[in-house]
Amino acid sequence: INLKALAALAKKIL
C-alpha cells in the first residue's frame, strides 16, 4: 500500500 492509497482510505474513513 502506498501513501496515495493510504490518504484515500483516510479520507474515506474520516
UniProtKB/Swiss-Prot annotation:
Applied relevance: The potent mast cell activator mastoparan-7 (abbreviated Mas7 or M7, which contains Ala at position 12 (K12A) and an Ile at position 13 (L13I)) can be used as a mucosal adjuvant to produce an anti-cocaine vaccine to induce an immune response that could attenuate the effects of cocaine consumption in humans. In mice, this preparation induces the production of high-quality neutralizing antibodies, reduces cocaine penetration of the blood-brain barrier and protects mice from its psychoactive effects.
Annotated consequence of substituting residue 6 to W: Moderate decrease in mast cell degranulating activity, and no change in antimicrobial activity
Domain of life assignment: Eukaryota
Disulfide bond entries: none
Subcellular compartments: Secreted; Target cell membrane
Other information: Mast-MO, a derivative peptide with an extended N-terminus (the FLPII motif is N-terminally added) has antimicrobial and immunomodulatory properties. It exhibits increased antibacterial properties comparable to standard-of-care antibiotics both in vitro and in vivo, and potentiates the activity of different classes of antibiotics. This derivative targets bacteria, and rapidly permeabilizes their outer membrane. In vivo, it displays direct antimicrobial activity, leads to enhance ability to attract leukocytes to the infection site, and is able to control inflammation.
Annotated family: Belongs to the MCD family. Mastoparan subfamily.
Role this protein plays: Antimicrobial and mast cell degranulating peptide that interacts with lipid bilayers and activates G-protein coupled receptors. Shows antimicrobial activity against some Gram-positive bacteria (S.aureus MIC=5 uM), Gram-negative bacteria (E.coli (MIC=50 uM), S.enterica), and fungi (B.cinerea (MIC=8 uM), C.albicans (MIC=25 uM), C.albicans, C.glabrata, and C.neoformans). Does not show antimicrobial activity against Gram-positive S.mutans.
Protein's name according to its UniProt entry: Mastoparan-L
Source organism (scientific name): Vespula lewisii (Korean yellow-jacket wasp)
